[in-house]
Amino acid sequence: FVVLGMQAQQHVMTVDVSKPTARINPAMYGIFFEDINFGADGGLYAELVKNRSFEFPQPLVGWIPFGEVTVQDERPCFDRNPHYVRITNDGCLLRAGLDNEGYRGIGLKKGEDYRFSAYVRTPDTKPMKLSVELVNSNGENLLKKELEVKGSEWQKLTAVLKAPFTDVRSRLRVVLQTEGTVDMDHISLFPVNTWKKRENGLRADLVQALYDLNPGVFRFPGGCIIEGNSLATRYQWKNSVGPVENRPLNENRWNYTFKHKAFPDYFQSYGLGFYEYFLLSEDLGAEPLPVLSCGLSCQYESNEVVPLGELG
């Protein structure tokens, strides 16, 4: 046998970047966002409270009530999100209220400010006293702020809380201190330091990461999530705009893709809706590419189709 060794030939390519030969369309490179694995609620959308409007099919998912806490829907604050909680302190129990666990925990950073808000009312003639607390993973409430509730009409309460600790599994706690009753809805906690400091804003660190990619096009809000598991749960963009408190909850296409992988707490609050997506496109300097429902549900889950004559 004869083995012939051949030395690999070397080639040199010289590129003169000062003389571009063809223009590359900036829209050839971009990013595609879809709410998978808590990508929106619990991710890019900076809201820290899960199920803030008590509209999940099991209305207290994400909440740990203590004392007398019930879910009501009479004379609601928001017609498309009618459920709220009624907290009653009868004077016999040590306390009455509820904790929110967030999205696998509420991540807080020491020294950072967080904006609490809620819609409240009381049937009692005297003012009610609420305490809003930040509780660490050891169960210690290291920050407590008291707020006053008075009047039988819905009103919005707000407060800024400065976190005294860093903990990725914190909780938000609301306690009715006064003997009496208080109704609460749309209980919310946002970092003040969102992207561009906007209320109802996005996580600054995640948007910065997207911005640094310098995308030419931004596609949203997804692919399969648009179809929904059925036509009833398809993404309808008109429900994702308007006052954030009254945007109706929708099921997430990815909450039970497989029978052995069900996520009963995976829904879409629409707090991150079409208005916010278009605004984000402007911030990124990217062309917006919205995806709309064509009247076809996910064909893996159902075979529902809107008749062609009914599309509009």
Language model features with spans:
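Alpha-helical bundle segments that constitute or directly flank the non-heme di-iron/ferroxidase center
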Residues: 278
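Conserved radical SAM core fold
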Residues: 295-298
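Residue-level signal for the nucleotide or nucleotide-sugar donor/cofactor binding architecture
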Residues: 272
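Extracellular and organelle-lumenal recognition/adhesion modules and their flexible linkers in secreted
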Residues: 9-269, 282-291, 302-311
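Bacterial Sec-dependent N-terminal signal peptides
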Residues: 1-10
